[in-house]
């Protein structure tokens, strides 16, 4: 096998956190695991990651677990073709585990390639519960084929009104062993600016940066005295992760 490209973390600082992986792949499991390392950029299944299969005779309720509720209803509305394919499946694989504060992103490169291989073997759809993100084969392939790591594609930014202001927050950074992000109390006209700020922090953290408690944010056009505050817990339903609250200094709801 030719040498694979390293996915580095140039900003890495030890955090003591674990990268937590959770994917559900719907469709018939492959009969053999003959993955071409050079084609899919896979050197192996990362240590700490396990793959379990479920179907009609093995905990069939697990296959149906994510085919209900708000996220499923949203998928039916937004991506009916993908929802139809997933709904027909009676088997799935769950890819799950954790890695202690990885120094590189090679584990994630391996996972991206593994899931691409599963799609090429007939898997019909993949759900990322950490990011609340459903993937079709075409969408995953678009990311897989990109020349860069496309890490932002694996983290979602959600926005919603709150107390007459806006709230933006992420889901999905747990797969990189870093806190998710939240900005509350900004005016709606600043949504694009806040999105750019969040994307900057997503990239830094995915590449290994650790944002310290009280980190000040000084950017042109933003309020003075903005800073970062670590909050939450891994079972927080809004994030399924701990998070960093970016305090918008003159808001009513972020403090």
Residue ranges and their predicted role:
Residues 1-27:
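N-terminal alpha-helical "arm" segments
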Residues 4-9, 35-43, 208-217:
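Short secondary-structure junctions
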Residues 15-18, 45-48, 87-89, 238-240:
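A short, structural micro-pattern
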Residues 18-83:
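N-terminal low-complexity, intrinsically disordered segments
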Residues 25-28, 97-99, 185-188:
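Short beta-strand-to-loop capping motifs
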Residues 56-158:
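Internal, hydrophobic cores of structured domains that mediate oligomerization or house catalytic pockets
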Residues 132-255:
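Aromatic/basic-lined ligand-recognition segments
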């Amino acid at each position: 096998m030719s040498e694979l490209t390293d996915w580095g973390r140039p900003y890495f600082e030890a955090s003591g956190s674990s990268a937590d992986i959770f994917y559900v792949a719907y469709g018939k499991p492959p009969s053999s695991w003959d993955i071409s390392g050079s084609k899919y950029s896979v050197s192996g299944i990362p240590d700490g990651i396990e793959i379990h299969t479920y179907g009609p005779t093995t905990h069939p309720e697990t296959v149906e677990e994510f085919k209900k509720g708000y996220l499923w209803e949203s998928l039916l509305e937004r991506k009916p073709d993908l929802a139809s394919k997933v709904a027909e499946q009676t088997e799935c694989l769950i890819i799950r585990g954790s890695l202690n504060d990885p120094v590189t992103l090679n584990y994630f490169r391996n996972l991206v390639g593994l899931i691409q291989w599963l799609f090429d073997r007939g898997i019909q759809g993949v759900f990322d519960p950490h990011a609340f993100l459903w993937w079709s084969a075409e969408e995953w392939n678009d990311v897989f084929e990109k020349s860069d790591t496309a890490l932002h594609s694996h983290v979602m930014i959600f926005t919603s009104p709150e107390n007459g202001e806006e709230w933006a927050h992420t889901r999905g950074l747990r797969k990189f062993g870093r806190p998710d992000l939240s900005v509350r109390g900004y005016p709606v006209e600043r949504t694009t600016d806040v999105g750019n700020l969040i994307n900057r922090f997503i990239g830094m953290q995915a590449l290994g940066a650790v944002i310290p408690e009280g980190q000040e944010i000084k950017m042109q056009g933003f309020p003075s005295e903005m800073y970062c505050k670590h909050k939450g817990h891994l079972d927080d339903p809004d994030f399924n992760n701990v998070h960093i609250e970016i305090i918008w200094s003159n808001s009513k709801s972020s403090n």
